[in-house]
């Protein structure tokens, strides 16, 4: 029977790769050099989930695990912590933040569990104010996702719109201010554009939609329609760069109103 490797085996493989007689590339990697790879593997895992590609999900989760073990080995070499410390830490965190399972607290609904989780998280991180909780949201997060998390922190203390219509009204207000900034400085335009995006995220939160996913779908839809435009042009013996804006717009409208299964 073919050997089935364990987590301990995998950690030993990484250790050998980074050892004295190991791989020249693996030996010189740092947290900073692996930063982009960590992000890429996380996004590729999410893509596998979105596509419901279970076989690829298994592979991508392995790639994420590679990053975890790699970073752990870097710190073990420095004498700071190792993989067992990471596992010990996350195990203790899960027990601490689930007192309704491992303790005597009561939480019967997912909402109550999340409320307890956030309260315990603030206590654990010694966050005495809601502002500190907001500032703790990672800067490395995609901006739309970070905006949503910050808005949820504000909601926890009651600082929020009452209805989605109020949130939409804010979008209209910010759009008007952006229009007015067009004759002002780039700095003012940037500020107003940021305010508009922040307001749009608020609407997505009320609709219980992920703004990142919504934008990703919009990008995919744009590419699909652009492909239809280009194919129509090629079938007519034309090049996009040689067409007028009016011609392109006509093709675009045709693509927009045609049934495209890839946009469903």
Segments from the language model and where they lie:
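Flexible "arm" and connector segments at domain edges
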Residues: 1-60, 66-193, 197-264
